[in-house]
């Protein structure tokens, strides 16, 4: 549940944790007041790249590079995404949904190129690893969607890595 005690009731986002909150055009712009922007309100598979794409989209809305459509078009767009989200049945579909959402935001701005298909593939692998073993899924290594380089596997299994200091991380 999101909590915004500093906002007037008329502009508070009221929703449970979901992939596409209603009342937010492109998941960012408050439907009834286009000067109010919310970032990161979605349940997340994509985190930083989604936040970045949202921020670049918000920047372009503020700067007037992205023109807001009519109220009817905004409503149709929100309803389309909410309806698609409500039909999702499993994590793979949820990953596909959020990948498509993030790609759409990406394509609306000049955000640098990123390999969303590789990200989609990695998230699905990660989700299956999590189902296979909740204690070891974090011990996997993936390639960067920007550089393609593969991260080394961490020297200590996640379950037993109790010292998360930089010194321990870098010295083992």
Where is each model-derived feature located?
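Alpha-helical scaffolding within the catalytic cores
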Residues: 19-26, 33, 120
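Short, surface-exposed linear patches
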Residues: 15-20, 58-62
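Beta-sheet entry/capping signal
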Residues: 1, 35-36
């Amino acid at each position: 549940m999101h909590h915004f005690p500093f906002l007037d009731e008329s502009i508070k986002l009221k929703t449970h944790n979901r992939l596409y909150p209603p009342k937010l055009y492109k998941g960012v712009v408050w439907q009834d007041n286009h000067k109010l922007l919310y970032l990161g309100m979605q349940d997340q598979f994509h985190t930083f790249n989604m936040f970045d794409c949202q921020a670049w989209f918000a920047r372009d809305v503020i700067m007037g590079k992205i023109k807001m459509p009519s109220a009817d078009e905004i409503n149709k767009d929100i309803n389309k995404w909410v309806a698609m989200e409500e039909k999702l049945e499993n994590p793979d579909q949820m990953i596909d949904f959020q990948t498509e959402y993030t790609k759409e935001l990406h394509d609306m701005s000049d955000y640098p190129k990123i390999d969303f298909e590789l990200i989609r593939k990695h998230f699905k692998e990660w989700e299956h690893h999590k189902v296979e073993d909740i204690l070891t899924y974090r011990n996997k290594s993936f390639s960067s969607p920007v550089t393609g380089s593969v991260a080394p596997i961490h020297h200590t299994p996640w379950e037993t890595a109790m010292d998360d200091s930089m010194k321990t991380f870098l010295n083992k």
